[in-house]
UniProtKB/Swiss-Prot annotation:
The keyword Protein biosynthesis applies. Homodimer. This is Tyrosine--tRNA ligase. One of its GO terms (cellular component) is cytosol.
Length: 418
């Protein structure tokens, strides 16, 4: 199957410039292309992964990727479909974020093997060398204000206000495409569908300044069940950095996707063949309660981002927590699996009697409720059911001398730390 057809079949092409011309270029030989990543945080997230994996698919088809990290544009801020002006970050902060993002990209694209090995570029390298006057003369004169105002990302901000800084962002992104074309022969840019206006600024600059044709492919913005896209600004980001979103949390995210999304996400986020995914679909629809699609999706993406060992650890944490086998997990694994649950720092003066502690730690609201829960067998300490009202926590309950896990009922966890 032609790579363009595969991208379409996987639902990875939202919009493109001249499809026939782009398809022909991809058929005739190796195409150099790029995707840009602005350092707006110290990590990329699942919203970025769609474009990254699309880039990797093209690389596997023999084409050459350039990963552009926006050391310059990250200092400015992209206004695309944001309700308010982005906060400007210090140069030092952005430089740190650039390094973090470069490290993540290095694990998802092949930067070492073959004639089409990926290359990393930073647009600060060329923006730091051009003066404001030269930029206005050599770049700005090719863009009319009417053209810039016509962009949807700008229109949506006119009423509430947009700074010249953000207004000029599209020209900067256009200049990135121009520079990469001149230096590396790049003729294709890949990005999210909210970037269409900025991306076509690049094809416009290529056409007007160099009389060359550039192409654009936008990938769809992936939304959650409520219709929100995955992103930092939206507050529902699943980060690629394990310190921000643990492999276990990422595993749980994929395990909890809706049935209607599971097969679609297999096409977008995994490298399983379309034939394999079709077979999974048939089995999944025959027995949706077994959640086969979600299990395979979680396995494939966690392994892709964090590695096989992290996947096996996430799977083990899931199985042990489900069974209530707290003592089968290390404190490191427990911290990963129980991150985000209520946490209470035990004080030296605290009464460690189970009834008093349940109230002090906020597990229940009253001693009466605590006594009822204990007597009814609803309270567990490190997986062991406690029904003795006089039970008092001891050093034996401190796992690795760091924490104790309290469970109320089947699923409500609380962590005591020392």
């Amino acid at each position: 199957m032609h790579i363009f057809d595969e991208l379409k079949e996987r639902g990875l092409i939202f919009q493109t410039t001249d499809e026939e011309a782009l398809r022909q270029e991809l058929e005739e030989g190796q195409v150099s292309y790029y995707t840009g990543y602005d350092p707006t945080a110290d990590s990329l997230h699942l919203g970025h992964l769609v474009a990254i994996l699309t880039s990797r698919r093209l690389q596997l088809a023999g084409h050459k990727p350039y990963a552009l990290v926006g050391g310059a544009t990250g200092l400015i801020g992209d206004p695309s479909f944001k309700d308010a002006e982005r906060s400007l970050q210090t140069k030092e902060t952005v430089e740190g974020w650039v390094k973090s993002i470069q490290g993540q990209l290095a694990g998802l694209l092949d930067f070492e093997n073959g004639q089409n090995k990926a290359e990393m570029v930073n647009n600060y390298d060329w923006f730091s060398d051009i003066s404001f006057i030269d930029f206005l003369r050599d770049v700005g004169k090719y863009f009319t204000v009417n053209y810039m105002m016509s962009k949807e990302s700008v229109k949506k901000r006119i009423e509430t206000g947009i700074s010249y800084t953000e207004f000029a962002y599209q020209i900067m992104q256009g200049y990135d495409f121009f520079i990469l074309n001149q230096k590396h022969g790049v003729t294709l840019q890949i990005g999210g569908s909210d970037q269409w206006g900025n991306m076509t600024a690049g094809t416009e600059l290529l056409r007007r300044k160099a009389d060359k044709t550039g192409h654009v492919i936008t990938v769809p913005l992936i939304t959650d069940a409520s219709g929100k896209k995955f992103g930092k600004s939206e507050g529902n980001a699943v980060w690629l950095n394990a310190d921000k979103t643990s492999p276990y949390e990422m595993y749980q995210f994929w395990m909890n996707v809706m049935d209607d999304d599971a097969v679609r996400f297999l096409k977008i986020f995994t490298f399983l063949s379309l034939d394999e995914i079709e077979e999974i679909r048939k089995q999944f629809e025959a027995a949706p309660h077994e959640r086969l699609a979600q299990k395979i999706l979680a396995r494939e993406v966690v392994t892709l981002v964090h590695g096989e060992k992290a996947y096996q650890e996430a799977l083990n944490i899931t199985e042990q927590l489900f069974a209530g086998n707290i003592k089968n997990l290390s404190v490191k694994e427990l911290k990963q699996g129980l991150r985000g649950v209520p946490n209470y720092q035990v004080q030296a003066e605290d009464n460690l009697n189970i009834v008093d502690l349940l109230v002090t730690a906020g597990v229940v609201n009253s001693k009466r409720q605590a006594r009822e829960d204990v007597q009814n067998g609803a309270i567990y300490v490190n997986g062991d059911r406690i029904q003795d009202l006089d039970y008092t926590l001891s050093d034996a309950d401190k796992l690795e001398n760091e924490l104790t896990v309290i469970r109320r009922g089947k699923k409500k966890y609380f962590v005591l730390t020392y």
